[in-house]
Regions:
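Short cytosolic juxtamembrane segments of multi-pass membrane proteins
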Residues: 182-190
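Membrane-interfacial helix-loop-helix junctions in multi-pass membrane proteins
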Residues: 122-176, 189-190
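Transmembrane helix boundary and interhelical loop/hinge segments in multi-pass membrane proteins
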Residues: 13-37
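Hydrophobic/aromatic residues in alpha-helical transmembrane segments
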Residues: 13-16, 25, 60, 92-93, ...
Length: 190
């Protein structure tokens, strides 16, 4: 279930990025720019409404996993809470793509590569510990393995080990969010 949740959340990147790129090329965003909102307000307006969608995806993933034997317990609730920072990671990536690329086709192309990279670099297909070495170090330098591990640890109710992985996920979300605001602001002025 943790890998399914991270895989599902990775699709939020394409959704948010495509929505942003489409809005930027339409008159909808031009009308919004006449309001006294700041760039960060627009970015938050794309981010916050997607969080309930991420939670619904998580609930659907757990419902499917329960069909295959996952038991409902407090860890399930913790994992849904951990899904919020994981979703913020992928939402911030979508914001970055939507701000950087001018068409939804470009966002979709790059986003599809990102979804596939997430699957392989998070250990969803094959545990990265089995491969080890440089590949494991590379995966651990990226947020995807930490996202899957955070959900896995939350599900196991190992909250002490969870914090380091959540730190990595939130750090990357922040690192993707800041340039999104800057690029969006620059593109809207130009």
């Amino acid at each position: 279930a943790p890998s399914m949740m991270v895989f599902g959340a990775s699709w939020l990147t394409i959704f948010v990025g495509s929505l942003m790129a489409t809005d930027r090329n339409s008159s909808f965003l031009m009308r919004l720019l006449s309001t006294p909102l700041r760039s960060v307000d627009y970015i938050l307006g794309y981010s916050i409404p997607v969080l309930p969608l991420a939670l619904l995806q998580g609930i659907a993933s757990f419902a499917t996993a329960m069909i295959f034997g996952l038991s409902l317990n407090l860890g399930t609730f913790y994992a849904l809470l951990v899904l919020i920072p994981v979703a913020l990671l992928f939402i911030s990536l979508g914001l970055l793509l939507g701000s950087a690329f001018s068409s939804s086709n470009a966002v979709s192309g790059f986003g599809t590569i990102l979804v596939n990279a997430t699957v392989f670099l998070s250990g969803a297909v094959l545990p990265i510990e089995m491969i080890g070495g440089g590949f494991e170090a590379f995966c651990n330098a990226l947020p995807f393995a930490h996202a899957a591990k955070a959900v896995q640890l939350a599900l196991a109710q190992d909250l002490n080990s969870l914090l380091l992985h959540l730190f990595w996920v939130l750090l990357y979300a922040f690192l993707f969010f800041i340039p999104s605001v800057w690029i969006f602001k620059k593109r809207m002025k130009g």
